[in-house]
Amino acid sequence: GHYYRGREGKMHRWYTRDWMQYLAVKDNYHTGYPDVNATTYQTQVSAVHDALEAAVQRQLMSDVPYGVLLSGGLDSSVISAIAKKYAGKRIETDNKADAWWPQLHSFAVGLKGAPDLIKAREVAQYIGTIHHEINYTIQEGLDAIRDVIYFIETYDVTTVRASTPMYLLARVIKSMGIKMVLSGEGADEVFGGYLYFHKAPTPQAFHEETVRKLSKLYLYDCLRANKSLACLLYTSDAADE
């Protein structure tokens, strides 16, 4: 998080985590080391797996209808699968008894015939969500740009472009009464999923770039994900007032 200092006219980070420093993580095991201990490596993989499942499960402790955003990519597919796993169990029985209601709904948005929609449909069929595929036209996207800029409060071209489909998707989600959605946002920054990460010259350069990307999430990807969806899921249609 950040706080604003008026006299300086800029934002300040209010905390620094130890993992932000390369020296704090440089000795972590990974398969690239010739002397890697298989048991230790598997223990760390299991720890990440368990932490991710626990994080998703924690978000499902909600008293409002929820769903998942499913693009068909690895990140959103994993989150959707975990959400389906726990949404299918009753919390009050410590996830032992099956839950017959509510059923988990997944949502995908794109131009008609987009490859991502096909992949999202396949994943939804595999994990068993009630899937909703929302198509929009180029003209609908252009018509929405004014409202998108109003809600996300930025003129950054890339952010506006990526926010427009999410805004159109949010309108459909809201009309269905869904109040909360999970997505795979942030995974590429945490795990170095972008293609250019493969060209990192050193482990330190890789780590420093992931930290840099994480520190800027609130300006771009999270700005898009939070504001383009939250403006419709949690507020009135302010742009029409």
Task: Give short role names for the model-derived ranges.
Residues G1-T39:
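N-terminal segments that mediate ammonia production and transfer
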Residues D27-S236:
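ATP-dependent adenylate-handling active sites, centered on carboxylate activation for C-N bond formation
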Residues D237-E241:
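A short, hydrophobic C-terminal helix/tail in secreted or cell-surface proteins
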